[in-house]
Amino acid sequence: MLRIFLRTQSVAAALIFLFACHGQAQDLRSPADPAWSVPQMGALPYDPAGMLVRRGHDLITATYAHIGPAVADEAKRYAGNNLACSNCHLNAGTKKFGIPLWGLKGLFPQYSFEAGKEISIEDRVNSCMTRSMNGKPLPVDSEEMKAFVAFIDFLSTGAKRGETLSGLGAGKMPELKRAADPVRGKAVYARTCAPCHQLDGQGVLRDRHLLNFGYVNPPLWGPDSFNDGAGMATLIAFANFVHFNMPNGTSYTHPRLTQQDAWDVGAYVISQPRPKRADLDKDFPDRLAKPADIPYGPYADGFSQKQHMYGPFGPIRAAIARLKAKKN
């Protein structure tokens, strides 16, 4: 049911990488303007620049085979799990509302509330590496980083600087007035998600003896999944991604899960055990800029960790708005 990864920070561009940011997804009710079409990689020349873009595509679609924890060259073991970036950035980052990577070249550098400073596109890639991929940062001057950035830049072909293209993020469905229910979500998971991701959430390996072959269907929790600092570990990101993309192959124009089912199954999945990221208390140094569904403290609003995890989020946002008004 789920090809995974996400979290957005401040603007729609931050809704981009594998499993790590937080912020603003586009509202599906907004006009689909400006339009965008996928650049064709086959039209690229086989020169060094074209080959670097192709290398970036390979890294997105088969991350585990190039920089995963089981690759032969230990110096290349940057990722800490055997996922692929395209588990979350569907169709190699080209699917509308499948957390696409298009149009991002002109949106960086940008301010990140999570980091509390301006970040580059390379910083954003490394946020995914350390959160969604549960690994370590790529050197900025490494071949792999240059290839990632070259592919993202290629997907921005034709986009104007500062232009937010239609389809970024994972969509935006109405939130529940109640808390999402992980108990009900468990039943939804068993019925809808387990056929692909297994009842224990551990996914399906291509070869159980060769982890660097990756997964047919990725794990949604457990030691080889994204960590608790990733964007997919937050309910709003996960539930919207599921509603508009899952089971795999679903189009955002014809969701197969109801909104209620998506919220509840999201609550179930994010409640499951996964790797722990250190120093999460340092995220969002401005506590009033912390999104309502970040499932780890500290918080400035007085609400419980449980409500930040499952909602409802409206009362949290209202409290934050009051605190901001008082501060100003």
Predicted features along the sequence, with ranges:
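Post-cleavage N-terminal segment of exported redox proteins
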Residues: 2-67, 110-182, 304, 309-328
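Sequence/structural segment immediately N-terminal to covalent heme-attachment motifs in c-type
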Residues: 48-92, 177-217
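Extracytoplasmic electron-transfer domains, predominantly the class I c-type cytochrome c fold
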Residues: 50-54, 59-67, 87-89, 94-138, ...
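Surface-exposed patches in mature extracellular/periplasmic domains of secreted proteins
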Residues: 66-75, 136-141, 161-165, 253-256, ...
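Secretory-pathway/luminal and periplasmic proteins that interact with or process carbohydrate-rich
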Residues: 66-68, 87, 92-98, 155-160, ...
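Short, solvent-exposed loop/turn and secondary-structure capping segments
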Residues: 71, 96-102, 160-164, 205-209, ...
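Short acidic alpha-helical/loop segments enriched in Asp/Glu that coordinate divalent cations
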Residues: 165-167, 199-214, 253-255, 280-282
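A cross-kingdom marker for long, charged
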Residues: 273-280, 285-328
